[in-house]
Amino acid sequence: MYQIVIETEDGETCRRMRPSEDWISRAEAERNLLASCRAGCATCKADCTDGDYELIDVKVQAVPPDEEEDGKVLLCRTFPRSDLHLLVPYTYDRISFEAIQTNWLAEILACDRVSSNVVRLVLQRSRPMAARISLNFVPGQFVDIEIPGTHTRRSYSMASVAEDGQLEFIIRLLPDGAFSKFLQTEAKVGMRVDLRGPAGSFFLHDHGGRSRVFVAGGTGLSPVLSMIRQLGKASDPSPATLLFGVTNREELFYVDELKTLAQSMPTLGVRIAVVNDDGGNGVDKGTVIDLLRAELEIDLLLGHARRRRRRETARSCREDHRDRCPAWRSDFLEKFLASG
């Protein structure tokens, strides 16, 4: 038996485990850590700071080679070969010590095209007796939605907040996507769909009142919008900036919604960029990285081939700008894979 120490952002918890068990499976009987598919989606990513382990069946998209070298692991794919010390990116109160219901039935309330390649889907959780009830989640989390009559599921982040009582999703349409086809040809108001979740560890962290900078491209706006809406409902006084971008102007969406949100939140600034555009009408020409560079007055290296150097450069920039730009004192990122 090995001693496994899971350290949260504000404490730690221990559990002994047999070598044949991954951490997520062993923990299920007593506690629920943040996880989703149990098969390598990267929701349960953590840092191993000490000990020997074996990572089994991990996709390179979930843990790239450079991250694996740095000690990144997926708890659902990590099998200990010695005592381990693991760091998770959330606080102790995110761990549940009782069973959590993760399967739900929901009804489609709206399914509307909001740009050339984006659909707004609104769901309402329901019970068999048609009583509508809310589904509790943390802004930034996601659920899996199943196409009726199939076993095909896709993961999408909520753009709404739990207090609204509805689940709003901003979904990109892909040419050969199964869920994209469902949205365009089959989805109807009143139709019921199965949900699984919520899941995910990408959410707002305590930042001590410092300013926040949110960066979102395309439908990556969805979880960010949920977070900002939550800040608005809480009347959070901290300065916040949203940098949002798309490739072409016809792909723009929620411009009016963002403008209204900024008007209702005096501490929120919104900037929008379009790559293939001359700018104007409240839109800048360029990428969200261009907006971020202007916001922080630093240079970033781009390109997949330079990922390691980019990360090292960004880390150096954070060190150089900690005093001048509080937003760089901590950063949180969630990678999104195309999901049609």
From Swiss-Prot:
Residue span(s) of domain FAD-binding FR-type: 101-205
Question: Is Iron found in the keyword set?
Answer: yes
Record InterPro entries: 2Fe-2S_ferredoxin-like_sf (IPR036010), 2Fe-2S_ferredoxin-type (IPR001041), Beta-grasp_dom_sf (IPR012675), Cbr1-like_FAD-bd_dom (IPR008333), FAD-bd_FR_type (IPR017927), Flavoprot_Pyr_Nucl_cyt_Rdtase (IPR001709), FNR_nucleotide-bd (IPR039261), MRET (IPR050415)
Pfam families this protein is in? FAD_binding_6, Fer2, NAD_binding_1
Q: What is its EC number?
A: 1.14.13.25
User: What does the note under cofactor report?
Assistant: Binds 1 [2Fe-2S] cluster.
- Any GO BP: one-carbon metabolic process
What are the UniProt keywords, alphabetically?
2Fe-2S, Electron transport, FAD, Flavoprotein, Iron, Iron-sulfur, Metal-binding, Monooxygenase, NADP, One-carbon metabolism, Oxidoreductase, Transport
| Cofactor(s) the record lists | [2Fe-2S] cluster
Binding positions for FAD?
Answer: 215-229
Q: What class of enzyme is it?
A: oxidoreductase
Is the Oxidoreductase keyword given for this protein? yes
List the molecular function annotations (GO) for this entry: 2 iron, 2 sulfur cluster binding; metal ion binding; methane monooxygenase [NAD(P)H] activity
2Fe-2S ferredoxin-type domain location: 1-92
Q: Which residues bind [2Fe-2S] cluster?
A: C37, C41, C44, C76
Q: Which reaction does it catalyse?
A: methane + NADH + O2 + H(+) = methanol + NAD(+) + H2O; methane + NADPH + O2 + H(+) = methanol + NADP(+) + H2O
Quaternary state and interactors? The soluble methane monooxygenase (sMMO) consists of four components A/MMOH (composed of alpha/MmoX, beta/MmoY and gamma/MmoZ), B/MMOB (MmoB), C/MMOR (MmoC) and D/MMOD (MmoD).
Q: What does the protein in this record do? A: Responsible for the initial oxygenation of methane to methanol in methanotrophs. It also catalyzes the monohydroxylation of a variety of unactivated alkenes, alicyclic, aromatic and heterocyclic compounds. The component C is the iron-sulfur flavoprotein of sMMO.
Q: What is this protein called?
A: Methane monooxygenase component C
From which source organism is this entry? Answer: Methylosinus trichosporium
Origin organism lineage: Bacteria, Pseudomonadati, Pseudomonadota, Alphaproteobacteria, Hyphomicrobiales
Q: What gene name is given for the protein in this entry?
A: mmoC
